[in-house]
């Protein structure tokens, strides 16, 4: 069964289940109305019929049945809501199979134009690689996924062993489609991702809360329990002895005053600090429970699961405390709970105990969930593309890039033209070709497949073997009038950045598309030659696309370092664009030819 058919069938099953539950809801509603009406009827009948004790029994039975139906109705409604979220997730996955990724965040806010390659390789924005991958439900998860796409292993000491572990985790989660869909559905209840930063900041601020000295005394809970015991003893004495009600009432008021005024400041501060993230905390409870309940086998996922071992109980306790603080808004309930049970006092003790046991750990748990989100996103991408293959990542201390039958990931495998290409360390490959011949798409295919490989993801090639190195591209330089930067000046700044970053790394692959296009042809040629001669002295390997045929002469003067490749086209009554890269220099250019045809057609 193909993926489209799988999701079509799954959506159909969800629709049937939802319809059945909604039908059940109508019966529950009818039952609630019926038994509530019967309850009122029996109570009225009790006041009208002599010796109507049996009416009270029937009323009590109706009330009990009504309560049970309400519970079943609430549970049924939660199941309908959960199925609705799951349907949204599955529908988004089904649309993704047709090339519609609008349901997923595009990560445009992660894009920094000065990044080494993010802008040129379409990592962020509409129809970007990030949007095709993104299944995150929190902002921390989105940040982690963006970090992996923009930070290559060569930049933060990750090696080929780390990449292999990453691949194992991705493959494992790719096979868990049901688990992944349920995970995404848990965070699908709001229009925007859960704000991890708000939760982290609230938890950090919560750790700074100060508690009264008496709250920290270890005998306080014992004294509180003893006081509550005295109150109930006084109440019993009031009922069964001549003792007046003044004593238990006075004691209750004293308990209220002691509990309320001792805890009110701390609870108010706690509520103001973290109460506004109750919804986010509830979602984290559900996500962490889902993670810890799973059965994982890969080392990476098992490590994350072990880190979250205590988190479900801790977050559930935090959620319970926040709900208790929120319920204090009911003044009458707050008064009686403090007067009878000193609830505020025990709530403050719970907050303090929670902080003592989990101080500093909650932030690590949030990061662990973010890691799972990034892996879930990559696993979903792997599942959506069964045609892709695993790359071979070598430990070679040099630039190694050997691709056979590779193509751009955004293209349909049925329509994409596959190419073979090998990049050797320290060599430069000058690619010439006409407009629309496929040079830029080829360069982006090189870069994006490398990023996928460095993250343990499947690549779009029959075979791809790469080493770990740094990457820098210059393909989409633009002017910035707000800063007074012209197009040509922006190009110079980009090339300066290239030299600076390449000098910091052991091995760098540069991908350039038509450098120095902001000046005239002769100046552009001389400048390009000067620049390439300079970078040839550095630990740099390069692929350069250009329209300047003169640059191909570098192969003649430096055959040991420079190599010519081209995308040739066939011009005629029907233009042919093979999109195949071959050795040599392009001979056909199409700008003048196409312009002449356009002018001829306009007459």
Summary of predicted features, one role per range:
Residues 1-434, 442-471, 493:
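Alpha-helical coupling/stalk and coiled-coil linker elements that connect catalytic or binding modules
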């Amino acid at each position: 069964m193909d993926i489209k058919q799988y999701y079509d069938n799954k959506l159909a099953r969800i629709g049937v289940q939802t319809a059945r539950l909604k039908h059940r809801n109508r019966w529950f509603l009818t039952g609630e109305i019926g038994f509530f009406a019967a309850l009122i009827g029996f109570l009225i009948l009790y006041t009208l019929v002599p010796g109507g004790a049996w009416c009270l029994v029937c009323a009590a039975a109706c009330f009990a049945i009504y309560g049970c139906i309400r519970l079943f109705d609430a549970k049924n409604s939660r199941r309908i809501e959960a199925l609705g979220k799951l349907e949204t997730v599955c529908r988004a996955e089904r649309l993704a199979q047709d090339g519609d990724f609008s349901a997923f965040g595009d990560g445009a806010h992660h894009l920094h134009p000065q990044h080494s390659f993010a802008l040129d390789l379409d990592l962020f924005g509409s129809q970007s690689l990030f949007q095709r991958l993104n299944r995150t439900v929190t902002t921390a998860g989105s940040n982690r996924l963006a970090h992996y796409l923009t930070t290559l292993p060569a930049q933060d000491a990750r090696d080929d062993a780390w990449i292999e572990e990453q691949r194992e985790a991705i493959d494992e989660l790719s096979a868990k489609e049901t688990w992944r869909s349920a995970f995404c559905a848990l965070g699908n209840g709001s229009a925007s991702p859960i704000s991890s930063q708000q939760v982290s900041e609230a938890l950090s601020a919560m750790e700074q809360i100060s508690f009264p000295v008496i709250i920290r005394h270890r005998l306080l809970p014992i004294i509180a329990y003893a006081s509550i015991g005295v109150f109930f003893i006084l109440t019993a004495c009031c009922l069964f002895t001549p003792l007046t009600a003044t004593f238990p009432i006075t004691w209750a008021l004293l308990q209220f005053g002691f509990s309320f005024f001792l805890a009110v400041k701390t609870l108010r501060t706690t509520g103001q600090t973290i109460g506004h993230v109750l919804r986010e905390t509830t979602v984290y409870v559900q996500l962490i429970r889902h993670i810890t309940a799973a059965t994982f086998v890969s080392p990476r996922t098992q490590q994350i699961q072990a880190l979250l071992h205590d988190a479900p109980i801790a977050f559930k306790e935090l959620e319970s405390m926040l709900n208790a603080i929120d319920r204090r808004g009911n003044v009458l309930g707050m008064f009686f709970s403090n007067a009878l049970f000193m609830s505020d006092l025990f709530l403050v003790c719970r907050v303090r105990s929670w902080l003592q046991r989990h101080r500093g750990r909650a932030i690590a748990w949030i990061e662990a969930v973010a890691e799972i989100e990034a892996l879930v996103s990559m696993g979903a991408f792997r599942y959506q593309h069964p045609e892709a293959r695993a790359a071979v990542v070598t430990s070679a201390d040099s630039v190694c890039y050997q691709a056979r039958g590779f193509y751009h990931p955004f293209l349909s495998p049925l329509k994409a033209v596959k190419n073979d290409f090998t990049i050797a360390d320290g060599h430069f490959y000058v690619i010439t070709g006409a407009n629309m011949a496929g040079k830029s798409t080829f360069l982006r295919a090189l870069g994006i497949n490398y990023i996928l490989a460095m993250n343990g993801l499947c690549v779009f090639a029959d075979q791809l073997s790469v080493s770990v190195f740094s990457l820098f591209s210059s393909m989409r330089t633009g002017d910035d009038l707000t800063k007074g930067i012209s197009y040509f000046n922006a190009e110079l700044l980009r090339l300066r950045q290239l030299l600076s970053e390449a000098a910091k790394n052991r091995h760098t692959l540069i991908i350039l598309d038509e450098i120095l296009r902001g000046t005239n042809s002769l100046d552009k040629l001389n400048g390009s030659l000067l620049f390439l001669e300079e970078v040839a002295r550095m630990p740099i390997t390069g692929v350069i696309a250009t329209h300047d045929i003169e640059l191909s002469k570098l192969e003649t003067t430096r055959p040991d370092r420079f190599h010519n490749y081209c995308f040739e086209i066939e011009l005629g009554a029907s233009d042919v664009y093979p999109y195949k890269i071959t050795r040599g220099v392009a001979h056909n250019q199409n700008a003048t030819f196409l312009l002449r045809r356009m002018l001829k057609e306009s007459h």
